[in-house]
Design a protein with these regions (language model features):
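Bacterial N-terminal signal peptides
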Residues: 6-19
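Histidine-rich, glycine-flanked metal-binding segment
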Residues: 35, 40-81
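Alpha-helix-loop-beta-strand connector modules within alpha/beta enzyme cores
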Residues: 144, 148-162, 224-249, 286, ...
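Divalent metal-dependent hydrolysis catalytic cores, especially in the metallo-beta-lactamase
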Residues: 114-139, 153-162, 205-218, 246, ...
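His/Asp/Glu-enriched, well-ordered alpha-helical/loop segment
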Residues: 242-246, 310-311, 317-404
């Protein structure tokens, strides 16, 4: 929202600084050379963004007078946009460097690694993420530490342990039966999944993630094979929504995708083997598609040296090309496709590399940025908090020196990061 009258400055700034007793350092003004409107896709030149504490209080024409008391951040030579968001991360995991690390690290050690990964993600310009799958509620602990200001990192919506069937993608299947290995989220049957969701809610999760099909990085599961019955999926969705939690369904295979959409999930993760009917079903029900179209390149190039078994590399080969075709189909049909990368499969902090792939496989640069800002905010239900540079929203702001609408790869290395009014990076 823009304001072009001098009176507004007097009301918003001077009143805040004097009548309300606000300290001068609480007011920051960003001078933006170009400002991207994530809702309309328009770009406006020479804009002032006024910030009080952690919120944006005004967006004004650049010729308005700035009070002497305000701190000024000069980004007049930069392209300014909302902090971007990634809807599929594993910030407490790091398959990219060591496929078997999870078998040798304690949850405590993995959570400490998550602190490092969270900071890398924030410094890449990702001010909000969804973490979809973490045992022992490691992601809950990390989210809380970030929210309490103890460590730097993005805003996090977290799922805790992912639900899955016995022996499915969300179970642990690599060791023999004498180890009696079982993932935290394994639950079979409609009442068992309800109990698991209630437990997750008890320990503070923001959403539910479950595995509706097999996957790439699990042993012994076919990528497209459907897991969970419709009855079980409907129980997962009903129980989650009863508790005000949205539902993300890991689903590669088309039948599992359709079953999850019918059950009422909020997002389909991966969505590798889509057909037109599945896309239409999702569009009719308002389902989001969260499709990771960069990580295949990393896995095929570096997976073997990082210990990824040949079985899993072969499954990645099976999925990669087809998933990108599905991405193009969903974009062309007008589905809600959000930015989601599966970080942890590739190195944390490289999330921005997916923007160029999104454009290569069908999005315009504007669509690619919106998929990581206004559209992701809609999926989270946080439209009144993040996803745009507007009055009342968190001051989550990034900037680059080039124009990402001309060269989307500019977003692979951002120059400025602010989250909640605090500057974390400024080149």
């Amino acid at each position: 929202m823009r304001y072009g009258v001098k009176l507004f400055v007097g009301i918003v700034l001077s009143t805040m600084l004097t009548s309300m007793g606000v300290l001068a350092q609480d007011i920051t003004v960003i001078k933006a050379g170009s400002l991207f409107d994530s809702r309309s896709g328009d770009v406006t030149r020479d804009v002032l963004i006024v910030i009080e504490d952690d919120r944006i209080v005004a967006v004004m024409d650049g010729d308005e007078e700035i009070p002497d008391e305000a701190e000024v951040i000069d980004l007049s030579d930069s392209f300014v946009l909302p902090g971007v968001m990634d809807m599929h991360t594993h910030v407490v995991g790091n398959l990219a460097n060591n496929f078997f690390a999870g078998y040798f690290q304690s949850p405590h050690r993995a959570t400490i690694g998550g602190v490092v990964n969270a900071e890398k993600t924030l410094m890449a310009g990702f001010t909000t993420i969804r973490n979809v799958g973490a045992g022992d509620y490691m992601d809950v602990a990390l989210r809380n530490a970030i929210n309490d200001g103890e460590v730097p990192g993005p805003r996090m919506a977290v799922s805790g342990p992912s639900l899955g069937i016995t022996g499915g993608h969300c179970d642990r299947n690599s060791l023999n039966s004498s180890f009696e290995e079982r993932s935290d989220g394994v639950a079979d049957g409609p009442w068992a999944v309800r109990e698991k969701i209630r437990t997750n809610v008890k320990y503070g999760v923001d959403l539910t993630k479950f595995c509706a099909t097999g996957g790439v990085f699990s042993k012994g599961t076919k990528v497209g094979m459907t897991q969970y019955t419709l009855e079980e999926m409907e129980a997962i969705v009903d129980e989650s929504h009863t508790h005000g939690r949205k539902v993300a369904a890991h689903a590669h295979g088309n039948e599992g995708i359709k079953r999850a959409i019918i059950a009422g999930v909020d997002s389909i993760e991966h969505a590798s083997f889509l057909d037109e009917e599945a896309v239409r079903m999702g569009m009719e029900r308002g389902t989001f598609f969260a499709m990771d179209i960069y990580n295949t390149e990393y896995t095929l190039e570096r997976g073997a040296e990082n210990g990824v078994p040949e079985e899993n590399i072969n499954k990645e080969r099976e999925v990669g090309t087809r998933q990108r075709q599905s991405f193009t189909l969903a974009v062309e049909m007008g589905a809600k496709v959000v930015f989601a990368t599966d970080s942890g499969v590739y190195p944390h902090g490289d999330n921005g590399k997916q923007f160029a792939r999104a454009v290569r496989f069908g999005m315009t640069p504007v669509q690619a940025i919106q998929s990581a800002t206004s559209l992701t905010a809609e999926l989270l239900g946080w439209e009144d908090q993040v996803g745009a540079i507007e009055e009342g929203l968190y001051a989550d702001i990034i900037a680059v020196h080039g124009d990402p609408l001309d060269d989307i790869s500019e977003l692979e290395d951002v120059d400025f990061v602010m989250k909640g009014g605090v500057v974390y990076k400024s080149k």
